[in-house]
């Protein structure tokens, strides 16, 4: 066979022209140790802190420890089939999750993947889970309310849009119930919600999702799940993922509410990761940066000004402020709020709602202790009518607790003291509220007005609940226009006061409770 040199050169030229290769410079390393969800990798010289490392089987790990000879990374998912000698690659990017309106009404995992069986999610792109919080210049003061629907909270511990309000208490004191009711109450308020479940039983999360659906609030909510059975890395990252999903709405001039349930379990997951990475332990075996773990998360909840929104949307949205309100939950052990994580989160947040076991067991639900619960910035955001009327409620309850303790030792009480005690008892009874029954501003105003103006005087203690239910039914039926006016404006003036008084006088005359 005769080889023609011209043919060969033409063939080589043709092959060279057709040759198409995509060259991608990627750092490759080898796993040298695997244990408890932590891998140690040798050879990743160019890896960044927090960078995603690609593992076989479409899985990823996150580089957390950058050491001289190796990299300590935490695996996001199952790791049983990983072994020494397995090759891994850097990706050059940090963890991102899908964001957008398509997530509303869906249940997703830490990585934003759907786990509700409703098919793929139509997202508006991806955003990094770790973002620096807006600076001082980008922020605006809190001045609009977030109505939780709870009389005890909205009257005494008001929450504003862009605030961080901690819900703290022992297990089984109604912390999750309060947060879920706050989400249900946003059904028609236009506030988008994100519920982040960290380290909880799958059955508990399923129950929460079912309740949100029953009350028509799931369509307005993103549920992010990192259950107790999932890897510690996913539990540690879930709050950051949820925060990124909530920031999507804040940065576009809308209002969002995020619940972290709960940050104690996130801190435990982070402690586990840190100890496995052989980082030095500190108080209660938590690592030294556990404060930063929560502060960098909670600082992202804020109210941003019009300029920030306009700049972020490149002029598509103008004249609107955005907000992300956070309700972190912390579980205490035997009421010990001076433990490490509770004190950290109390110092980071703008106030706290203390729920107490004794109050819960005595039948006072929500079990809010108004003496040590506080809202540091919410007062400026409180609805005008509630602010005007509720001033005496906290005072009445504080005096009642003081006198109740004193009256145990005093045999005879003067009339003024007895009247104060009776008023305090009735106000305490009035603050009780059933789960999944949030109240509108007008309903709260009517009930507080009745307490403030002495309409509860002479009503038997066990009849206070019946009085309240009958009063609200009467006002909604007979004074619907007034109730609508209060709900729409939140205003309080002499005219509204006169109409409220006339309505209550008329109701008391009926004696229908």
From Swiss-Prot:
Residues holding ATP: 169-176
Subcellular location, record wording: Cell inner membrane
Reactions performed catalytically: ATP + H2O + 4 H(+)(in) = ADP + phosphate + 5 H(+)(out)
Keywords: ATP synthesis, ATP-binding, Cell inner membrane, Cell membrane, CF(1), Hydrogen ion transport, Ion transport, Membrane, Nucleotide-binding, Translocase, Transport
Matching Gene3D superfamilies: 2.40.30.20, ATP synthase alpha/beta chain, C-terminal domain, P-loop containing nucleotide triphosphate hydrolases
Entry's EC annotation: 7.1.2.2
Site feature Required for activity, where: 373
GO CC annotation: plasma membrane; proton-transporting ATP synthase complex
Keyword Disulfide bond attributed: no
Gene Ontology molecular functions: ADP binding; ATP binding; proton-transporting ATP synthase activity, rotational mechanism
Chief subcellular location: membrane
Family matches, as InterPro entries: ATP_synth_asu-like_sf, ATP_synth_asu_C, ATP_synth_asu_C_sf, ATP_synth_F1_a_nt-bd_dom, ATP_synth_F1_asu, ATPase_a/bsu_AS, ATPase_F1/V1/A1_a/bsu_N, ATPase_F1/V1/A1_a/bsu_N_sf
Keyword field contains Cell membrane: yes
Pfam families in the record: ATP-synt_ab, ATP-synt_ab_C, ATP-synt_ab_N
Membrane topology reported for the UniProt record: Peripheral membrane protein
PANTHER family: ATP SYNTHASE SUBUNIT ALPHA, MITOCHONDRIAL
Function summary: Produces ATP from ADP in the presence of a proton gradient across the membrane. The alpha chain is a regulatory subunit.
UniProt similarity note: Belongs to the ATPase alpha/beta chains family.
The protein's assembly and partners: F-type ATPases have 2 components, CF(1) - the catalytic core - and CF(0) - the membrane proton channel. CF(1) has five subunits: alpha(3), beta(3), gamma(1), delta(1), epsilon(1). CF(0) has three main subunits: a(1), b(2) and c(9-12). The alpha and beta chains form an alternating ring which encloses part of the gamma chain. CF(1) is attached to CF(0) by a central stalk formed by the gamma and epsilon chains, while a peripheral stalk is formed by the delta and b chains.
HAMAP family: ATP_synth_alpha_bact
Protein name: ATP synthase subunit alpha
Source organism: Shewanella amazonensis (strain ATCC BAA-1098 / SB2B)
Gene this protein is translated from: atpA
